[in-house]
Regions:
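Residue-identity detector for glycine
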Residues: 8-14, 31
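Cationic, low-complexity basic patches in intrinsically disordered or flexible, solvent-exposed regions
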Residues: 25-29
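Residue-level detector of alpha-helix initiation sites
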Residues: 184, 262-263
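Conserved active-site-proximal phosphate/metal-binding subdomains
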Residues: 116-132, 234-257, 263-413
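Thr-Gly-centered strand-to-loop micro-motif
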Residues: 54, 73, 180, 258-259, ...
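Active-site entrance/lid segments in N-terminal catalytic domains of soluble metabolic enzymes
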Residues: 34-251
Length: 413
């Protein structure tokens, strides 16, 4: 069974060299076609192995897709022009394999309902108390806070109109999935997906959210437990995945991708044993050679334990899991903290602050390292080295196969 699974998801016989069934496998090798796993996600996305990799780095996206998984590019940080360049690069480097994009269109945001909100108009709303608190914090660590000039018409962070423009750019490329987080996708997004025959996925952190997404017409649910990096809820993946699957089953058959803390093929197999159709992953790719993260942050990831990945409002204004640092302690624990501002105002503060922190750390400011942080899940405790994205995909496949073999052995006659 182990060799058969490995062959189906890797197309390689060599991985099974230690199996007791090796002789039989050799006899069957001739004429055997490479097969994909039996998962609705594989069928919907045209992939070999239902491992989805969210990343802001185009190199990771392309490498994962080439290796048989499915790369998903985080598009929210881009303008339409920069996204066009990124997608063109992916098209040229993905070897014809499928990939997707992810956007953020929050339902609950402090500027909801307001028109023509720009980055500069939001800057004017940031209280002086919060500006001074940030500047004083960085000064304690010999970091000069520098600001980035923005255009008068630059949209606010997490702007819905901009997100839809990004989708229009994306549909000029052969994307196979669009995903949204922080709420039900706008009706226009779902309609665009149907028009282009591209599945729409939505991230959820609670059963109630999943029911709303199913009613709205999404094609795939990414059920994300609290272990996940970035914005997340309070229910664990182990509880949330079966809870959602049970709740939506009488309504409509919507494939579920498990997310939150999944760093290994064994964890992926466990989630699929609960009924998930595959896995959505993020943090594991931050420790790859292709990742956009700095060498300093990778070193901090390797040194971290799972308890160092905490939920904090200090970066975006919403609870988001990230690596604990002097920054998170200052906003969440310090008695003189003014408290995080609501989304998107806190992002106005944190963007320039973290740009300044990262520059100082890269320039050799040893004290600045204490403030270096990024979004990462509790699975960070499982990271012990930096590897290539392709090697990580291969490890997922091998560990998945071993986990399935282990379970089969438990019930073997």
């Amino acid at each position: 069974m182990l060799a058969q699974i490995r062959r189906g998801i890797t197309g390689s016989e060599g991985l099974a060299s230690n199996s007791p069934r090796k002789a039989k496998q050799e006899e069957q090798r001739e004429g055997r076609r490479e097969r994909t796993m039996k998962s609705p996600i594989c069928d919907m996305l045209g992939i070999e192995f239902p491992l989805l990799a969210f990343s802001h780095c185009r190199d990771v996206v392309a490498a994962v897709s080439r290796a048989g998984g499915f790369g998903v590019l985080g598009a929210t940080v881009h303008t339409p022009a920069t996204l066009e360049r990124e997608l063109k690069w992916i098209d040229d480097h993905v070897d014809g394999k499928p990939y997707g994009i992810d956007v953020l269109i929050p339902e609950n945001i402090s500027t909801a309902g307001e028109k023509d909100v720009t980055w500069k108009s939001l800057e004017a709303r940031v209280p002086q108390e919060h500006r001074k608190y940030t500047s004083d914090l960085l000064k304690k660590y010999d970091i000069e806070l520098t600001t980035t000039e923005v255009a008068d018409n630059q949209p606010q962070p997490f702007d819905a109109k901009t997100a839809l423009e990004l989708l229009k750019v994306s549909f000029n490329h052969p994307i196979r999935l669009i995903a949204n987080a922080l709420g039900v996708p706008p009706k226009a997004m779902i309609e665009m997906g149907k028009k282009h025959n591209v599945p729409v996925a939505a991230l959820v952190g609670a059963k109630e959210h999943a029911l709303r997404q199913v009613a709205a017409g999404v094609d795939i649910l990414v059920v994300q437990g609290t272990e996940a990096g970035g914005h997340c809820g309070e229910v664990s993946t182990l509880v949330l995945v079966p809870e959602v699957i049970k709740a939506i089953k009488p309504i409509r058959n919507v494939p579920v991708l498990a997310a939150g803390g999944i760093m290994t093929g064994r964890q992926m197999a466990a989630c699929m044993a609960m009924g998930a159709a595959g896995a959505w992953t993020g943090s594991v790719w931050l420790a790859t050679v292709e990742s956009e993260t700095s060498e300093i942050f990778r070193e901090k990831m390797i040194a971290a334990s799972s308890r160092d990945a905490i939920r904090s409002k200090g970066r975006t204004g919403k609870p988001a899991r990230q690596l604990r640092s002097v920054w998170t302690d200052a906003w969440d624990r310090a008695p003189d903290s003014p408290g995080a501002l609501p989304m998107p105002l806190q992002s106005i503060i944190s963007r320039d602050a973290f740009n300044s922190i990262d520059r100082a750390a890269a320039a050799g400011n040893a004290r600045a390292r204490d403030l270096v942080s990024y979004f990462v899940g509790q699975g960070v405790g499982l990271i012990d080295s930096v590897k290539s994205a392709g090697a990580v995909v291969q490890e997922f496949k091998e560990e998945f196969a071993e986990a399935v073999e282990h379970m089969n052995a438990l019930v073997a006659e």
